[in-house]
């Protein structure tokens, strides 16, 4: 018996149960896998299937396959596993049609289907994500959330800034967010994406699509991406697009990272938004001051650690009118007494991090005022985490952290473990420093 032929049959049982593999497609898919794994004929023996049908994720079967391939000396096993899960998954057009049909029947159900599919086909690696460290800090009026994400690599602000100017040798796909990643085989410095599935949509007349984040910072963490590879931008059109999105998918919030380094996200060279089901702490913030309240609109400033202007109305057009005015005023606003300078020459420093939500028939737009100025004392950003805190995190403070969920780098779990050992033992601290030199930053 060929071990791989048995594993193929197990994977087919899993796909029938969890990935909507149709009986008509079973023979076809079996032959694709036999060819992919260089196996001449299928397994004909008895097969225990009950435990496979009860699996919620494919990790057990993928571990079997990983070990079998390793024993045969196969290279690039992880890329091959993604390819196989892509073969077992429904085609992108089938997924799109089902998501849209379910959404039309019950808002949120289509996005639930896509989210669960992406867990079951291992695009979202739930077991790995469940290992992330999470804790919540309650305050008198609100709370903050903190997670150590063990999957996402740590980046420096200088590296993020280079994305806008760097030339790359391979230009397909142009970046990790491009729609051309759909089904892409991957390479040494670019992940395989055969198992990703997306939902196309239109925002303000432009072609966009929704996919889920493989890092899943929070429940149903989605990325909404422009079909065109164009730089991040914040403009009047941004506010309209965000509000149009929550009109189509009212169970989700959606927000945009700002378009400037330090106060933006880690990908500046492709326009995208982020959203999901999870209600982040900023949504629970109360008004600090109400500027305007009538039958059409309410405008207030929140009691929050960033300056957040919240605009609420039943009309998208009304919100956009006020949001445009806030944006236009903020990007030229100066107050040197608190180090706010909007421009240095032609270089703009001020921008907005906008977040939209729909509550019943009321639209809400939260506008976080941002400024990325630096000076001699704070070369990494006046309004960024200062140097004395970079041992915790030095990356830019993006949309999600500005909303109250702080995503810390994976090294912290390891480093804190060593520090705990140091504090609870009589071992020489210098021995730890010699073995783990990155502890010196603490």
Ranges and model annotations:
Residues 1-224, 228-231, 303-306, 320-323, ...:
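Active-site microenvironments that recognize anionic phosphate/pyrophosphate groups
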